[in-house]
Amino acid sequence: MPTAPGPEHATDSTTDTAAAVLARGLHLARGARDVVGGLELRIAQGQVVGLFGSNGAGKTTLLQALAGLLPVRQGELRVFGGAAAQARRAIGYVAQGVPDGAWSRLRACDFVASAWQGERWGIGLSPGGRARRAAAVREALQAAAAGHLAQRGMDTLSGGERQRVCIAQALVNPVRMLLLDEPLANLDPRAQLGVLELVRALRDRQGLTVLLSAHDINPLLGLMDSVVYLAGGRGRQGRVDEVIEPGVLSALYGLPMQVARHDGYLFIHPARGFMAEEGGPCHHGGADAPDAHGPGNGHGHDHAHAPAHAPSKDLP
């Protein structure tokens, strides 16, 4: 199973002109609480990057900062060469969770149309504007392999279908980068695979840069060009084999970590001796500390482990 970037998507460190994202000494906060500090990132255009870490480690915070929705507390964050807020129109952002309330009662085509930027400029009020909006919605749904869902109500769609429509909404305006917050959450293995195949197609056919956060690293191993792992207010970017290894993870978490490999899957857990000395994972404290277990437990945290029902290890 490939874990390193292929040559066509390899990171080019010799120049920053090809960087979709560049961060130097980046500090992000939620109110008075520092979330991420001193983060260094360089993501080339056209790459797929996985974002992982414990609950509260800052994954959503980082995605929102990249989307221009959250200010930088300290350091530098550049998106396509400028400030993230200036690049907002070039970014499609899909937040975690599913549409609820009034949004859930819309048809899929109307849900996608609600994000068309022409509405902001008054274009949607004219017959020509309505035609352009309809064309943009149709193209976005087709790009997300969701054209057949256009007339369906959002509340009638499966989890995988809803995720495709949400991605279509992010594509209804011309974008160069997609930010997906937990797009695989609560999806069965077949639906997960469908979303990841869509991400691959958007990268390969449209050259989009894609950052997506996930609880489980394993479904993404054949797709990612690099990984960003956040823990303990710090972060590290690199190839999977550079970041998902005991030395790096121990430094991030501030406690001894191990990485086990079995049948092509990765399991991350505190070192066995540490658990015995400290009385188990309930005693080594903090929101950033992962518990140690295998697949099949009902839980909602962000470190990497094999899924209870493992999806295909290699995407087509």
Predicted regions and their residues:
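The feature captures the beta-strand-to-loop junction immediately N-terminal to the Walker
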Residues: 52-54
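Helix-to-loop junction immediately C-terminal to a conserved catalytic motif
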Residues: 67
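Conserved ABC transporter NBD signature motif
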Residues: 75-89
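Conserved ABC ATPase "signature" region
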Residues: 128-149
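Conserved ABC ATPase signature
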Residues: 153-157, 161
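Catalytic Walker B motif of ABC-type/P-loop ATPase nucleotide-binding domains
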Residues: 178-182
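ABC ATPase nucleotide-binding domains
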Residues: 246, 252-316
